[in-house]
Each structure stands twice: as structure tokens, then as C-alpha cells.
Amino acid sequence: MSQTGMTIDNVLDSIQHPTDVAKLDADQLRQLADELRERIIGTVSQNGGHLAPSLGVVELTLALLSVFNPDKDKFVWDVGHQAYAWKLLTGRRDEFSTLRQYQGISGFPKMAESPYDHFGVGHSSTSISAAAGMAMARDLAGDDNDVIAIIGDGSMTAGLAFEGLNQAGHQGRRLLVILNDNEMSISKNVGALSLFLSRNLSSRWVRRMKRDVETWLKSVPGIGEEMLNYAKRSEHSLKSFFTPGMLFEAFRFNYVGPVDGHDVRNLAKVMQMARALDEPVLLHVLTKKGKGYEPAESNPTYFHGVGRFELETGAACKFVDSDSLPSYTEVFGSTLCSLAEKDERVIAITAAMPEGTGVGEFSRRFPDRFVDVGICEQHAVTFAAGLAAQGFRPVVAIYSTFLQRSYDQIVHDVCLQKLPVTFCLDRGGLVGEDGPTHHGAFDLSYLRHIPNLTIIAPKDEAELQQAMKTALAGEGPVAIRYPRGIGVGACLSADPGVLEHGRGELLKKGADVAVIAVGSRVHPALAVAEEIERSTGKAVSVFNARFVKPLDAEQLVALARSHDSLLLLEENTTTGGFSSGVLELLADHDCLAGVHVRRLGLPDDFVTHGTQKQLRKLTGIDRAAIRRTLLEMLGLQE
């Protein structure tokens, strides 16, 4: 790589090693930033992904690689939504077209994927804690590498981030936390004075001078202490007026910023000064989410995480099978609004995902009954418990994978007290391209054993409506889990009925083999059973459990006693999941003797990324696997 300013046709393709970025001149860095954005936009338009966050940190990524050595220094990208440029510059340029594709590279940093992904992420607010641990490990090992955590302003709303700040500040180890602020709420602070404060009030020379002046003032008899106190008040007043850093300084971090996150050269200079401080430093960087792509700049919320879109306009690509059918998320959102119209006790709570969970319309129609707590799942659950304790009917709208973060609150604050909180778990089961950090693979297992909790897994969008009305009509906690994606085309109701508590339904009566399914696997099982009967004459029973807890003991025992074989289906890990519960119940009723049982569900493993269709095939829960298993159980050939 040249430092002479010579023109390179394609700078990105010339990068052979991450350290090559440090050899580029200003013009080449600008060209590289443009090329990175072009590659990211083109790939995400085809594959979907987190576009706006990654576009906003291109220059920040270049500055990091201009200053630090990724072969030695450790980087932790919080959540990982913003790590696409990092992937392109750290050896995955040629594979980038496979981003989020089955057997391609992950959409998140992943330790198993690259030696430059120093910590795997996917859920928010973990970076500071992980980096603090790495800094301690470095010091214990006697190494001298830098440790850098890059965290967005959204992730800083979580308690875990402040727990990490508290620990890191207390330990006082050399650590750089970069706060990527893309909300632009304090953009007015970007300017000459802010730059002066960033470069000078925190520089090593000024800090040494300040200590010398303090020592001298203390030696002045009579007025020294008073002068020192006045000087400190003046300095703190100046800094707090122009910067928001006092909060971080309270955690014993040296605050630097805010600085322009799109000025590579200046950002690199500030990083160089920050790394020279032998203590925790928080560098506050201002970026524009979606920068370089007008549709994403105009609508960064939509382009935060997006499916395939038209490159020229940013319009979402249309798919034939989704043009007319609503998604489960949309059905949930519209049903919640309908129920809230009739019951003023209904409160909607989300953890920083109003649109993703379907409560955006609720927030606009019922702003006084809507609460976005930020990325604070633990708080969301206990906050809901407080509302429920006072007679309200809170609905916590959350992705299945994120509810894991509030497990103790579910047990201790909600279920122990039998409070009427409704948990609506979107993305139950295989979520698709976001992969193992986002699959809702464990909820039935980690919720099923909690006393007082009712769990419903509706078979379709109409049953989702019924489940919601059932939950809000009850007097205890209820969890409703449903998959990502469109429904099956079930008829929706303006006034859904209430489900009989703990009662499933026999959809098809047969002989010999009974399929006991729940949630997303019910309709595929029914379709396969009907196909087999048409082609072979063999009638298979199909039972929709509906309730994971309590199970319909009466009907399940009857099925076990009237069939030679049972096939149990779920889109959850079979370890401790729905099928485990069915087997426990049947064993307790002593009706498994002589009954052949097969289970199809998710494995005791972290499932990779890919489309839902690909992953259901991979894990053996798709229609083909159900058909193959049923034919084997019936003693038939394909």
C-alpha cells in the first residue's frame, strides 16, 4: 500500500490485511469509505440485514484500524449490527456476498468465524462488561494490548452497560469505550470548542499540568484551598455546559468528546490521545445512522434491520406469498389495539422495539398507555408487574430470545405473585438469517416449569387472537409464543372468542398413529396427514395441543391409550420442551407401555443462520421430515 497519494482503482480490493488501512492517505480513506458503503448497500439490498447502523460507522471503523492493531488489540462490537465494514476489512471481503445466507458468513461478529472477531455478540449491551474482563485478563497475563468496546447510544440504556461501566471504572484498568451516538441529539456540541475540550481538557499534558497547579495552590497559605475549589468548580462548569460527560466521569471514566464520527483523521488523532491514558476512557462519537444512502438517512428506523429492497428506491421487495397475508406481528398489533379499545386497563410495554414487535400503531393510538423502556428487559417485566399489582393488564411485547434476559423477574416478580402480566413472545422458534443469537429456541423449555404460568402456542393467526383475548380475560400470568413471518391465511375475527383453559383440539381422527403438535408445526402436520391419507388410505390423528401449560391431560392420555404410535412435534428444543412435558404427563399416567414415540423438534445445539425454510429442513421439522417420519411409523415406503 502506498502513502504517497497515488490513485488506486479499488482501494477495498487492495486491502490484503487489516493493518493496510493505516497506510492509506486521506484521499484513499475517503475513497475506501465510499467503496465500503457501496458494497454494504449492494449486499444488504439482496440479503437483508442491518443497513443503517453499519453505514453510520464506516469512518469510525477506518479510524480504529488506522490507530489500533487487530492482530494484537481486542475489539468488542456491541450487538454487532454495525460490524459489516469490520467484516469487509478483516478478511471477509470475498465472502461478504454470503452475508446472513445459509453456510455463509454471519450477520454478527462470531469468534468461530474470524480471529478478528474477538467476542461473539448479537444481544445488546454486553460489550463493556466483556471488554472489562479482557482488560483484566490482559493485565494478569502481563500483556500490553489495547481493549476497545464500541457501543451504541441505544445499548447504553441497558442496566448491563452501566454495570460494566461501574466495574471498569472501579478497577481503573486501561480500557477504551467508544460511545457511538447516532441519535444526533447533541450535535450542537460538535465544533471548535468541543474539539478543543476533547483534545485538551483530557490530554496527558493538561492532566499533568493540572496536578502540578493543584499541588502549588495547596501550598499557598490562607487562600490556596479556596482558589483550588474555585478552579475545580470553573472547570467542571465549563465541561458540563459543553459536554454530557459528567455522568461517565462519575463512573471514574475520563470522558472525551463529543467528536465527529465521520472525520477519520481527526477521530484517529483523538483515539491516539485516548489510548495514551493509562485508565478507562469513554470516547463519545457522533455519527449519522444510514449515512451515504438517502433512503436510510431519511428513515433510519426502517433501515435499521431490513429485508431485501430495491437498490434505487429503497422500497421493499415484494414476494408473491406475502402480498395478501398479514404477519403474526401485524395480527398481534391490530388485535392488541382492538382489545385496548374495549379495556382501558390494557398497557403495552416494549423494550426498544415498538415497530419490530408490532406495537407501533398502539403507541400512536394510545400514547398514554404505551411504554418503551429501552433495552431494559428486566425492568420491563418488573415494571409490568407493578402495573398488574395495581389492577392494570400489561402486555409485554418482546422477542422470545430477549425474554431470556429477564428470567428472574418472570419467576420472582410476576409468577410467584400470580400477577396478570401477558408476555407476547414474537419470533418463537427459528427466526432465520439473524441466526443463533436470535432464534427463539428455548422459551418453552425455560418457561414450562414456572408455577402459575400459562403458556399458549397458537397454531395460526386466528388462534393468536383468541389466545390474546384469553390472556387478558384471566387473572394470572400468560405467555403466548408465535413465529416470525406471515400466517397461514386463517380467518381473522373482530371479536375473537376465549379459549377453554388448558384444552387442545383434535383436528383429525385416525388410527394407529397420532401426531401431537403445537404452534407452527400444527398446520404442516395436518397437511401431511391429509396427503398420506389421500395417497395411502392410512388415517393419522392430528391433535393441536394449543396449551403447553397446562397440558390437556384428558385428551393426551386418551390419544396415548388409543394409538400404537405417537409423533410429538414442536419448534423448540426438545430438551425440556413441549414434547418433554407430554412424555412426563403420559409417564405419570402410566400409559406409555407399548407405545412407540418419536419426537421432532430443535436439537440440543445452537442452530446456524439461514432462511426459515432452510433451517426447518436442516433441523428435521419441515413437512418433508414429518412425512418421512410418519411413513416410517406406518411401515410404508415413500
Curated annotation (Swiss-Prot):
Gene3D superfamilies: 3.40.50.920, 3.40.50.970. Mg(2+) binds at D153, N182. Keywords: Isoprene biosynthesis, Magnesium, Metal-binding, Thiamine biosynthesis, Thiamine pyrophosphate, Transferase. GO terms for molecular function: 1-deoxy-D-xylulose-5-phosphate synthase activity; magnesium ion binding; thiamine pyrophosphate binding. It catalyses: D-glyceraldehyde 3-phosphate + pyruvate + H(+) = 1-deoxy-D-xylulose 5-phosphate + CO2. It is an enzyme of class 2 (transferase). Binds 1 Mg(2+) ion per subunit. GO terms for biological process: 1-deoxy-D-xylulose 5-phosphate biosynthetic process; isopentenyl diphosphate biosynthetic process, methylerythritol 4-phosphate pathway; terpenoid biosynthetic process; thiamine biosynthetic process. Thiamine diphosphate binds at H81, G122, H123, S124, G154, S155, N182, Y293, E377. Its cofactor is Mg(2+); thiamine diphosphate. CDD domains: TPP_DXS (cd02007), TPP_PYR_DXS_TK_like (cd07033). Pathway: Metabolic intermediate biosynthesis; 1-deoxy-D-xylulose 5-phosphate biosynthesis; 1-deoxy-D-xylulose 5-phosphate from D-glyceraldehyde 3-phosphate and pyruvate: step 1/1. It holds the Pfam family Transket_pyr. Its EC number is 2.2.1.7. Belongs to the transketolase family. DXPS subfamily. Catalyzes the acyloin condensation reaction between C atoms 2 and 3 of pyruvate and glyceraldehyde 3-phosphate to yield 1-deoxy-D-xylulose-5-phosphate (DXP). This is 1-deoxy-D-xylulose-5-phosphate synthase. It comes from Oleidesulfovibrio alaskensis (strain ATCC BAA-1058 / DSM 17464 / G20). The lineage of its organism: Bacteria, Pseudomonadati, Thermodesulfobacteriota, Desulfovibrionia, Desulfovibrionales. The gene is dxs.
